[in-house]
């Protein structure tokens, strides 16, 4: 300041001023001015600094004077100094708050960066112009997994997705080259950009490198970049122009809650003709059915005085073409209040023959009272409108297609829009694979086009699936539609729509409208060609594939959804090729898809013939759930196998699940083509499914499902099923089969039951809407195939099996059969071998002889037998048949029965198995089968318990048994100790010898030691003794057989099963026919030659219709139930009576009587035999044992069988008949069976089936108690016959197997009911086990003989349950109990027929089963089975059965 004044203001130097003149003055003034300005500037800065202090703001609010500013500055400086001093001295925290804001920030630079990065939720990195990362923040690890050091000085491109390199370069060096050329001068300003890029996540195995293609996992990052054009000098480093980036995870879009929506299609009267709930299903929410019901109800409810929205929209849409409703509310059952709005559009199908229809999209809004109807729903609803003028007549399905008429782009737009909008999603999801609406389903917008189409498709599908379906049928008419119609949204699950999310947009042909068929539209949308998932209703595909393949590209949907979609029963997919006028394969595929969808959607949950959801059927939630699960399971099972077969057959040109639909031929394409390889599920999976199915499902479900696929097959091209698939997959059901099946099955069943064998023979093919099953016969797999072995070489053999449409019969049995069937189907060879080994391998059986049902059941074994012509069963007796029938029914059939008897067989009995089990037509095939069977038997025989158990576990048999699906016929009866011979009073000669093991020795060693062979004289009841018949003597007169020591050929269980089955068939066919006594070939059971007549009889008869079988099964089930009750009652009574009852002679009217009361005695035996026939004490009927027939040496074979039978069966019979039958009868029965079995040593023994012969089919009406009910024929004969026969059957493995083997040919239901026999073979031997499988076969489902049935009660495991009076008496209660204990597995209720279930408890049957000498063909396996047979694996038992 002094300087300023020095020169200018110095008064002492005025002269000097003047001397200097103006130039000096000017200079001085300019300098002072500058200084003044500078001073002012500093003061201003001070003021600013001070003003930063809140305390100074007031003072600085007005422009301060210099003095004040300076003063304040001084004060501030002093304050700062004072504070610093205080801080250093006191370091008081409170003082910190007083620190001036002008001081350094509270946040240090070091901590500020991390805080900012944390706030940004990203990491910071700097990239130089060369693309190298010169700096990266440490928190990059939490984002990309790389360490800071790993990325420093590395190329940024190493962590960028290749597709994002260009974008990054553009942002990094917008105006420079990567080589570091200096930034242009104009680029001096900083440029900021925000873009998204994919950054590589650090692979777990190795540090980030430039090539991480193997484990390329990228995270989408949002990068905010600032270019720093000027070089930056920091810490001595000169950073050239660089890009400063902050990368943060792309904010995850709020989870788009898929708009819940469903679509309805209404006809031009306002009636709902279909409902597409695929979108809701795909969403996976529970309660969607209720939602649909309530929403539709609210939509159709009048709004106060106003008409319902449905009516309003209907009127508007009919006039304007489109309409949308305001939001309306409804409350779900759980109290949730939802709002919804509906958009409707009038659609004109392309096809002029189709009527216009109204597509409505109902969008549910859970969050708001409702979307504005105009919201997305518009897009969703904006199905490309076809001008109303366009083919107004187009069918609704086409209507669906109509949207396709829009340029594909439009439809895509619409669909896409819809997809985007969750509500539209409904459409898109349903139509466009519900890809978007599925939301997560992953449909690309392109697929949404499909959605559009799909929307139409939903309509189309409903229509297309069954042109016949009257969409209009829906009861809902006009707005008055009742909820019920929409009620059953049926598991339309995705009618394939939801599942199709994957369709590429292009899959939709540009011009969807071109699709002529309603389905076509959808399908075009799903164009198979695109391999994207074709629109074929996923459900149908799934149903077909049902296996692993979720039919849909959208795996998102739960398996349940998938199953649900598959639930639409495949049969529903009867695609009518005509319906699908496919312009090209794509169209066809789309049409098929659509049809399937429509079917699926309409009958999703339940197969609806109409296939339309509109059906009033409401699925109650429970029902729907149940049906979903069971249907899903059943379908899963059926479709998996079916699919696999189909897939193989079709060659599944579409390897892609998605493309699965493609390639298949039009209609059939969807059914067969639809199935994808993915459907192949492992056997284990299938077993699991079966177990679940058995637990949850009902036979009807299974039947329906099984039939439906069959129908699909037939409707579509008949697909020759390669193999193991379940019978249904194999079965081609004619489309009309379902219509006729119910009544026809019953008629056929009755027909078969009542029809003589001859008649049957004459009409081998029943008009059961025969299901032609092309089963490529698989050669038997090695016996050891525990795994469902792939079918062995299939010897293609076509068998027409009556479609067993429904096996509603015994669910338990059916369930038991199912898993086995499943296995059998899968391992037909296995099953076959099992059956084969036990039975006469060489026995040639003409399936004709067998009733259709038997045929189906024994088809395979029979075929095997047929294959084994060398084994002729000369000795085959018609144990059941009347004289004529005996000839017709060779024991071969019995043998087949025996074979079938094995559990496998029984299980195989299910038509599916039967279909699969068509006998090989060629000798080679038969031989192969025989060889395989033998191998299997030998293999199993060689296994120890643990190995067998492992096999069982591997096959899931143990689970089946545990689940109660199968009662394993383990040797239920430990080798029975010699039971006190049931003393038929008259029978002085009880054969005390237990059944000998199958040893051919004439004398039946007493494997049933407890069983005394009864002499021919049967107690009080005289038994007509028919001379041993060398051949089937027409006269059934049964001579008491002398105890001929027929070498008991080891009866093959299979043979026994076959025999039983044959017998059952014969009985069924010839219930009225007297059992003709056939001599068994005296010697080698295997050597048994069938009479030519027998062989002819063997000619395959048309298998029973599936429905017939189902009916039988139902009857059988009821019978079983009654039997179980009776057995329990009897058991209790017998237990009480047992103490004395066992010892009582059969005639003593011991608890046996109990059995009798249960058994209706009223019906005299169908056999002409006089009541006394078998009962004549003096002459036990010739051995009635069916086994004897098989046995070359009737006596030997009988001896074994008879003793078994006598003990187990006769005792049982006695018990059963005892009351109903005179004590004489009972005695006779015992005697007779004993005598017949033992006494009739004659080779003829088997043929001479005394009425008492258990093998002889007794026409006895089914006992009211299924087991005990078998009414003993009024005539004493009948019961004895039954008893004897059973004894014989038991005694003879063949016989028994015959009884069992006689497949439940439709016999009189009563017979079957009666036939349901639990045969307890009391024998000393544990061999009974083997017997048991035989006995299981023996389950006389097929057997006509009530006596057999009567025996069944006897067979009851619990001796108490068994009638002790006769056979039971013979069998010591101890034996029975033992057998029961041993035979927990032994007793296996096998459903030979649906109608008949025999629980055969072989008591001491082991000898017979184990008889080393198979009845000729009996495999060593049966022989090997000894008491340890009880321990034998379930598998082995199943096989033996």
Swiss-Prot record:
Where found in the cell? Answer: Nucleus
Q: What is this protein called?
A: Nuclear receptor coactivator 1
Q: Which organism is it from?
A: Homo sapiens (Human)
Q: Which GO terms describe its cellular component?
A: chromatin; cytosol; nucleoplasm; nucleus; plasma membrane; protein-containing complex; RNA polymerase II transcription regulator complex; transcription regulator complex
Q: Which gene encodes it?
A: NCOA1
Query: Which residues are annotated with the PTM Phosphothreonine?
Result: 1179
Q: What does this protein do?
A: Nuclear receptor coactivator that directly binds nuclear receptors and stimulates the transcriptional activities in a hormone-dependent fashion. Involved in the coactivation of different nuclear receptors, such as for steroids (PGR, GR and ER), retinoids (RXRs), thyroid hormone (TRs) and prostanoids (PPARs). Also involved in coactivation mediated by STAT3, STAT5A, STAT5B and STAT6 transcription factors. Displays histone acetyltransferase activity toward H3 and H4; the relevance of such activity remains however unclear.
Biased segments, Low complexity type: 422-443, 457-475, 662-682, 1425-1441
EC number of the protein:
2.3.1.48
The opening ranks of the lineage are: Eukaryota, Metazoa, Chordata, Craniata, Vertebrata
Q: Where is this motif: LXXLL motif 6?
A: 913-917
């Amino acid at each position: 300041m002094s300087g300023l004044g020095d020169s200018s203001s110095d008064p002492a130097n005025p002269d000097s001023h003047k001397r200097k003149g103006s130039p000096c003055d000017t200079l001085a003034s300019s300098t002072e001015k500058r200084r003044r300005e500078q001073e002012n500037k500093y003061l201003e800065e001070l003021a600013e600094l001070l003003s930063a202090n809140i305390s100074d703001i007031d003072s600085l609010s007005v422009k301060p004077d210099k003095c004040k500013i300076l003063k304040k500055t001084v004060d501030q400086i002093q304050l700062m100094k004072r504070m610093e001093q205080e801080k250093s001295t006191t370091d008081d925290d409170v003082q910190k708050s007083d620190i001036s804001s002008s001081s350094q920030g509270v946040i240090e630079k070091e901590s500020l960066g991390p805080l900012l990065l944390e706030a940004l939720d990203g990491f910071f990195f700097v990239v130089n112009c060369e693309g190298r990362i010169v700096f990266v923040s440490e928190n990059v690890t939490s984002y990309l997994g790389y360490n800071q050091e790993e990325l420093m000085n590395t190329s940024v491109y190493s962590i960028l997705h290749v597709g994002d390199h260009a974008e990054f370069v553009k942002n990094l060096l917008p105006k420079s080259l990567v080589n570091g050329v200096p930034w242009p001068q104009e680029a001096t300003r900083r440029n900021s950009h925000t873009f998204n890029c994919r950054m590589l996540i650090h692979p777990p195995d190795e540090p980030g490198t430039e090539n991480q293609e193997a484990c390329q996992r990228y995270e989408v990052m949002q990068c905010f970049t600032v270019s720093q054009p000027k070089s930056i000098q920091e810490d001595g480093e000169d950073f050239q122009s660089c890009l400063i980036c902050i990368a943060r995870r792309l904010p995850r879009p709020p989870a788009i809650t898929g708009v819940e929506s469903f679509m309805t299609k209404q006809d031009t009267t306002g009636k709902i003709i279909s409902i597409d709930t695929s979108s809701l299903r795909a969403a996976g929410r529970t309660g969607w059915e209720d939602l649909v019901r309530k929403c539709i109800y609210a939509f159709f409810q009048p709004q106060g005085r106003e008409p319902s929205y449905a009516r309003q929209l209907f009127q508007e849409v009919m006039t304007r073409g489109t309409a949308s409703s305001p939001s309306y509310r409804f409350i779900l059952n759980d109290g949730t209040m939802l709002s919804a709005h509906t958009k409707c559009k009038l659609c004109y199908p392309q096809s002029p023959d189709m009527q216009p229809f109204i597509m409505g999209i109902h969008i549910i809004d859970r969050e708001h009272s409702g979307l504005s109807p105009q919201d997305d729903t518009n897009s969703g609803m904006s199905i490309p409108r076809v001008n109303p003028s366009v083919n107004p007549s187009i069918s609704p399905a086409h209507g669906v297609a109509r949207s396709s008429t829009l340029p594909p782009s439009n439809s895509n737009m619409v669909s896409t829009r819809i997809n985007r909008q969750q509500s539209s999603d409904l459409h898109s999801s349903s139509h466009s694979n519900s890809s978007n609406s599925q939301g997560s389903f992953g449909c690309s917008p392109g697929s949404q086009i499909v959605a559009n189409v799909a929307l139409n498709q939903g309509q189309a599908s409903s229509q297309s699936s069954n042109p016949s379906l009257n969409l209009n049928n829906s009861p809902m008419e006009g707005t008055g539609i009742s909820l019920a119609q929409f009620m059953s949204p049926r598991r339309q699950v995705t009618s394939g729509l939801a599942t199709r999310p994957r369709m590429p947009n292009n899959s939709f042909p540009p011009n969807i409208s071109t699709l002529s068929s309603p389905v076509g539209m959808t399908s075009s949308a799903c164009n198979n060609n695109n391999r994207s998932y074709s629109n074929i209703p996923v459900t149908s595909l799934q149903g077909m594939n049902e296996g692993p393949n979720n039919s849909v590209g959208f795996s998102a949907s739960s398996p349940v959804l998938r199953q649900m979609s598959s639930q639409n029963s495949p049969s529903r997919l009867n695609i009518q090729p005509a319906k699908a006028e496919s312009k090209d394969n794509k169209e066809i595929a789309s049409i098929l898809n659509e049809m399937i969808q429509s079917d699926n959607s309409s009958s999703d949950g339940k197969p609806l013939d109409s296939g339309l959801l509109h059906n009033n059927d409401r699925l109650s939630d429970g029902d729907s759930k149940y049906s979903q699960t069971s249907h899903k399971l059943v379908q899963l099972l059926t479709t998996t196998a079916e699919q696999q077969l189909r897939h193989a057959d079709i060659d599944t040109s579409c390897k892609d699940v998605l493309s699965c639909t493609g390639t298949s031929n039009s209609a059939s394409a969807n059914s067969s083509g639809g199935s994808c390889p993915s459907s192949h599920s492992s056997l284990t999976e299938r077993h699991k499914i079966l177990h679940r199915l058995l637990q949850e499902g009902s036979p009807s479900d299974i039947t329906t499902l099984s039939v439906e696929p069959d129908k699909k097959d037939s409707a579509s091209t008949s697909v020759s099923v390669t193999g193991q698939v379940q019978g249904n997959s194999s079965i081609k059901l004619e489309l009309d089969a379902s219509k006729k099946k119910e009544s026809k099955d019953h008629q056929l069943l009755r027909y078969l039951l009542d029809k003589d064998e001859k008649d049957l023979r004459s009409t081998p093919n029943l008009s059961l809407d025969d299901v032609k099953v092309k089963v490529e016969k698989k050669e038997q797999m090695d016996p050891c195939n525990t795994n469902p072995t792939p079918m062995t070489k299939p010897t293609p053999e076509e068998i027409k099996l009556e479609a067993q449409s429904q096996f509603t019969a015994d669910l338990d049995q059916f369930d038991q059969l199912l898993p086995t069937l499943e296995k059998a189907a899968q391992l037909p060879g296995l099953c076959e071998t099992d059956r084969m080994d036990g039975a006469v391998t060489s026995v040639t059986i003409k399936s004709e002889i067998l009733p259709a049902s038997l045929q189906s059941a024994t088809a395979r074994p029979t075929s095997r037998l047929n294959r084994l012509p060398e084994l002729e069963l000369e000795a085959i007796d018609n144990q059941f048949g009347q004289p004529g029938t005996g000839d017709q029914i060779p024991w071969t059939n019995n043998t087949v029965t025996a074979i079938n008897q094995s559990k496998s067989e029984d299980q195989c009995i299910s038509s599916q198995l039967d279909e699969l089990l068509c006998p090989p037509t060629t000798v080679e095939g038969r031989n192969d089968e025989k060889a395989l069977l033998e191998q299997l038997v030998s293999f199993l025989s060689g296994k120890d318990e643990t190995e067998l158990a492992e096999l069982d576990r591997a096959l899931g048999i143990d689970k089946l048994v545990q689940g109660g699906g199968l009662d394993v016929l383990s040797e239920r009866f430990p080798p029975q100790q010699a039971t006190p011979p049931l003393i038929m009073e008259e029978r002085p000669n009880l054969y005390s010898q237990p059944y000998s093991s199958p040893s051919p020795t004439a004398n039946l060693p007493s494997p049933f030691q407890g069983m005394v062979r009864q002499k021919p004289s049967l107690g009080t009841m005289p038994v007509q003794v028919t001379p041993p018949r060398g051949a089937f003597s027409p006269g059934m007169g049964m001579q008491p057989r002398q105890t001929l020591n027929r070498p008991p050929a080891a009866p093959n269980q299979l043979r026994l099963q076959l025999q039983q089955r044959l017998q059952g068939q014969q009985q069924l066919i010839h219930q009225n026919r007297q059992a003709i006594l056939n001599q068994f070939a005296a010697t080698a059971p295997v050597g048994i030659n069938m009479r030519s007549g027998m062989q002819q009889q063997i000619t395959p008869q048309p298998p029973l219709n599936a429905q017939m079988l189902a009916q039988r099964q139902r009857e059988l089930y009821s019978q079983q139930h009654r039997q179980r009750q009776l057995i329990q009652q009897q058991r209790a009574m017998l237990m009480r009576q047992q103490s004395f009852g066992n010892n009582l002679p059969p005639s003593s009217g011991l608890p046996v009587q109990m059995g009798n009361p249960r058994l209706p005695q009223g019906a005299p035996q169908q056999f002409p035999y006089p009541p006394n026939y078998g009962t004549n004490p003096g002459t036990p009927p010739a051995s009635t044992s069916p086994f004897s027939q098989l046995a070359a040496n009737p006596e030997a074979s009988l001896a074994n069988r008879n003793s078994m039978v006598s003990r187990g069966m006769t005792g049982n019979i006695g018990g059963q008949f005892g009351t109903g039958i005179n004590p004489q009868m009972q005695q006779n029965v015992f005697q007779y069976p004993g005598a017949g079995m033992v006494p009739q040593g004659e080779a003829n023994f088997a043929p001479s089936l005394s009425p008492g012969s258990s093998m002889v089919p007794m026409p006895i009406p089914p006992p009211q108690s299924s087991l005990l009910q078998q009414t003993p024929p009024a005539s004493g004969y009948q019961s004895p016959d039954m008893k004897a026969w059973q004894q014989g059957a038991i005694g003879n493995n063949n016989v028994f197997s015959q009884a069992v083997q006689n497949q439940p040919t439709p016999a009189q239901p009563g017979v079957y009911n009666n036939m349901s026999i639990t045969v307890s073979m009391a024998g000393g031997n544990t061999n009974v086990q083997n017997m048991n499988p035989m006995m299981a076969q023996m389950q006389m489902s097929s057997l006509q003989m009530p006596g057999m049935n009567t025996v069944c009660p006897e067979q009851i495991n619990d001796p108490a349950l068994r009638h002790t009076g006769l056979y039971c008496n013979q069998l010591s209660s101890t034996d029975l109990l033992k057998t029961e204990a041993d035979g927990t597995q032994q007793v296996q209720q096998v459903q030979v027929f649906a109608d008949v279930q025999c629980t055969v408890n072989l008591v001491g049957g082991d000898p017979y089963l184990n008889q080393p000498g198979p009845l000729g063909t009996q495999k060593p396996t049966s022989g090997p089975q000894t008491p340890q047979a009880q321990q034998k694996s379930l598998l082995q038992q199943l096989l033996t059965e």
